């Protein structure tokens, strides 16, 4: 049995097989997922697991180069936005790189998310709690 934070075998496998610049989406319960993207549905009930909890577990195993979020999160969900930026700042320090955060319109976010290898669906019931994480390399 693994002793790291992430125990979900399928999610761990997807992170391990991401190539440089390939992406993974972590989303709330409402984001539409393209049929072309593999879905890992972690949602058990409203709020479980939460978006931020899921982000923290995923980034404990993933080397992140940059991220994309919807512009709307800043106004419609400032608490999640601020906590998300804090998590990414801490990750930047741990990794020794600068993780650029790009803001796009929500409609563009949905298009970009359809290009990801996998979507991790949470039980989050708050607006615009979605992020696309792009894989980097630790060298």
Curated annotation (Swiss-Prot):
EC number: 5.4.99.62
Source organism, top-level taxon: Bacteria
Catalytic residues identified in the record: 20 (proton donor)
Main location: cytoplasm
Gene Ontology BP terms: D-ribose catabolic process
CC terms in the record's Gene Ontology section: cytosol
Pfam families referenced in this protein's UniProt entry, alphabetically: RbsD_FucU (PF05025)
Catalytic activity: beta-D-ribopyranose = beta-D-ribofuranose
GO molecular function, one term: monosaccharide binding
Subcellular location: Cytoplasm
InterPro entries recorded: D-ribose_pyranase, RbsD-like_sf, RbsD_FucU
TM ranges: none
Binding site for substrate: 28, 106, 128-130
Pathway(s) served: Carbohydrate metabolism; D-ribose degradation; D-ribose 5-phosphate from beta-D-ribopyranose: step 1/2
Keywords: Carbohydrate metabolism, Cytoplasm, Isomerase
Family stated for the protein in its record: Belongs to the RbsD / FucU family. RbsD subfamily.
UniProt function note: Catalyzes the interconversion of beta-pyran and beta-furan forms of D-ribose.
HAMAP family: D_rib_pyranase
Subunit record text: Homodecamer.
Name of the protein: D-ribose pyranase
Lineage: Bacteria, Pseudomonadati, Pseudomonadota, Gammaproteobacteria, Pasteurellales
Gene that specifies this protein: rbsD
